[in-house]
Amino acid sequence: MFRRFIAGSASVLAAMSCASAHITLEQQQAPVASSYKAVMRVPHGCDGAATTSIRIRIPEGVIGVKPMPKPGWQLNVVSGKYAKPYTLRGAKMTEGVTELSWSGGKLPDAYYDEFVFTSVLAEELEAGKTVYFPVVQECEKGIHRWIEIPKDGEHGAQGEGGPQPAPGLRLLPKR
């Protein structure tokens, strides 16, 4: 009985450590037509190497993006046209931020940090769906591509060498 408890506990802990090893959003759900502060949590580097760059692709319908600068990191903002117009405070938006990156810093593998931006979840987004923020994490040695997006009906995605899911945000009904 005790051995089964230990084996079961070890399995749960192993699953938890794998799940917490991914880059994730602090708040993983928010209502459409609302402001959203995205806090991207980076819990580790690449196989022991320090993180030197984080690049985030902004999904369609996440508009009005404003990144938070980080001391010691260079911030780069890429803007472009949206696939369709979105409404922001009564005005139609046809272009905006499509990618953010922080580079030139050094986050040792033994430490944790967060990369933050504010945004608006457009009223045109559909409640009940999930939007994904693909992230590329570059390190002194190596790279992680947290870009896997599950197909409809799947619970996760599998990349080379194991799961590398993109952080997801579940859209709740408008308040």
Each model region followed by its residue ranges:
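Extracytoplasmic/periplasmic copper-protein system
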Residues: 32, 138-175
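Low-complexity, intrinsically disordered segments enriched in Ser/Thr together with acidic residues
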Residues: 99-127
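Beta-strand-rich interaction surfaces with strong enrichment in secreted/lumenal proteins
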Residues: 26-27, 89-90, 101-107
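Low-complexity, serine/threonine/proline/glycine-rich extracellular segments that form mucin-like
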Residues: 35-73
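Sec/Tat signal peptide C-region and signal peptidase I cleavage site
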Residues: 16-21
